[in-house]
Amino acid sequence: MALLAITALAGMDLAQWQALLNNVAFAISLGAMLFYWGGAAFPQMQLLAELGLAGMIGANLTMAALLTARWIDAGYFPLSNLYESLFFLAWGITALHLLALHWSRSRWVGVMTAPVVTGIVAFAALVLPEDMQVAQPLVPALQSNWLMMHVTVMLLAYAALLVGSLLSISFLIVTRGQEVHLKGNSLGLQFRPPQPQTHPEWAEATLPSPASELAYAGLRSPRPAPSSAELPPQPAPEGIPWQRLSLAEILDNTSYRLIGLGFPLLTIGIIAGAVWANEAWGTYWSWDPKETWALITWLVFAAYLHARITKGWQGRRPALLASLGFGVVWVCYLGVNFLGKGLHSYGWFF
């Protein structure tokens, strides 16, 4: 039986491999989402979070293989239609998921990003028509070296902004939408001893003890650190436990770093698109719906970064602004295509 399966796989052409990888990517991302949610419901079961992480890595590799097979089959980088761009966006989100997880060590990253990846892959694999899932020759407007430069950078920018915005939404959930005072500044620059790299719980970040601060500074405490039972109970400001406040600070700073990564990519992508538009259509800017919403997206996240850098915003207010940006990115990427008009209308199937 196994030999027959191997023989069948060996005899598949690239189109059949793409269809198989399409379905495998959906199954793995769905499994990762369920594992992450199971780990959230039962935080004592560390294996669930580890399986969720393994699922996201597997989904990332599967989608990379799918895009590579499509690239070889079509002879061009696979970003010519909505199906291909959806899979590239999902791949970018899984990659940035791993980066955000490395920065934060919080399972909230997977709880929030895995459903988005699953939804994107399900939409591409199950909703889009089959003829769009087959590689087609490039339309004349896309036969340019600017295709990879512009579209790739824009989709990576969308991925970074979406993951950063999702972590801002996580911040609002953790703090229950309350205004809280975070110990770090808006830039996330603060002397903090390293957190223990154990498997995180819902409140995975703990406050450092005085002894750990001394050890981090290269000093030794004159006496052993008191145990948690010996320490007096700490009041929880704003009625939120200390552990949640520490987790909220991690989410806030990680969100800020991802948006700080996505914004320059968005800027470069818009500039590259303007240069390409001038070559293809004779004008740098034509107020096409996609161009207009790209500008709106840029302004929203420019306001976010301006408020954090120059006004010192942190916590609830920038999180609300980033949450607004989450919806704006989706309108820019997908929503305007429902209009069925404009220079970017080839991205939809109606």
UniProtKB/Swiss-Prot annotation:
Membrane association type:
Multi-pass membrane protein
Where located?
A: Cellular thylakoid membrane
Query: Which GO biological process annotations does it have?
Result: cytochrome complex assembly
Which spans are transmembrane here? Answer: 23-43, 47-67, 82-102, 108-128, 153-173, 258-278, 293-313, 319-339
Keyword tags: Cytochrome c-type biogenesis, Membrane, Thylakoid, Transmembrane, Transmembrane helix
Q: Which family does it belong to?
A: Belongs to the CcmF/CycK/Ccl1/NrfE/CcsA family.
Q: Report the protein name in the record.
A: Cytochrome c biogenesis protein CcsA
Cite the source lineage: Bacteria, Bacillati, Cyanobacteriota, Cyanophyceae, Synechococcales
